[in-house]
Amino acid sequence: MLEQLQTLKSEAETQINEASDLKTLNDLRVKYLGKKGPMTEIMKQMGKLSAEERPKMGSLANEVRTALTEAISSKQQILETEAINEKLKSETIDVTLPGTAPSIGTKHLLTQVIEEMEDMFIGMGYEIAEGPEVELDYYNFEALNLPKDHPARDMQDSFYITENTLLRTQTSPVQARTMEKHDFSKGPIKVICPGKVYRRDNDDATHSHQFTQIEGLVVGENITFADLKGTLTVLAKTMFGEEREIRLRPSFFPFTEPSVEMDISCFKCGGKGCRVCKGTGWIEILGSGMVHPNVLEMSGIDSTRYSGFAFGLGPERVAMLKYAVDDIRHLYTNDLRFTKQFQSTETGEI
């Protein structure tokens, strides 16, 4: 048995040292130290030895098993290190190659247009006022001189949530809320109200069930129609160019009296007539007027002392006109082929 153990140890160590990969090494471990290996067979034969030989052979067998286990462990470390080095060698990264740039996002076209208008009005002393998109019927209609059963309500087919709440059809409710809580001892009201609005329109190239509005409101003492015209002139020239002329046409809105719609001279043809202005030389931009006395009184404002004007326009329309967008749906479909055409200079990583 002594000779058998010595031969086994010598043969196993030779093969372990010659192992060139981890799979071969593991096969050798199973071959020599596994349940069916020669070491196990030798240990089973210990019972056949005499009482004098058994301790000596048992100790020697344990030494051989320990030696082979250590040899396998040592060889495994060597092979694992070689495998890692080989992998690193084959997967070397050339740090001098150009890197992959992170995706850069820019402000959406609508955001750019809205912020451009906000900046203009803030520069004129206006504040930004916001309100809930889920609105009370009272603020969306009644406080704006649109009592129940008023025919003008049909012009704004609405998404009702309950009998008295709906998705707002305009940002005018923010104006009503602002007037209710304003303290005129601190000065006049000068606010713009940007936000999303909702109407039951069928989506097409020029209509959407959800869109944005920016409405403006000024209320104070001695506010006149001339103030409204001056404000609209600044708006037209800022958004569409200094050479723009404006034209005010009589119109009707329940919450203003008198009411007018503003047209601007066509920026495409200079007023000569083209496809953009439909041959008229003018492009309709927004509705406006002097705040109706009933609206002031509904908000607790003395209409004999205070007056004001209001206006409202859609950033989508402004964007479509300025940038020749032929379908409002392009603004909402998130097609990067479209949105990347209007990258702003203000960027941020996505």
From Swiss-Prot:
Protein's UniProt keywords contain Transferase: no
Enzyme Commission no: 6.1.1.20
Binding site for Mg(2+): E257
Annotated compartments: Cytoplasm
Record field: transmembrane: none
Family: Belongs to the class-II aminoacyl-tRNA synthetase family. Phe-tRNA synthetase alpha subunit type 1 subfamily.
Name of the molecule in the record: Phenylalanine--tRNA ligase alpha subunit
Species this protein is from: Listeria monocytogenes serovar 1/2a (strain ATCC BAA-679 / EGD-e)
Top-level taxonomy: Bacteria, Bacillati, Bacillota, Bacilli, Bacillales
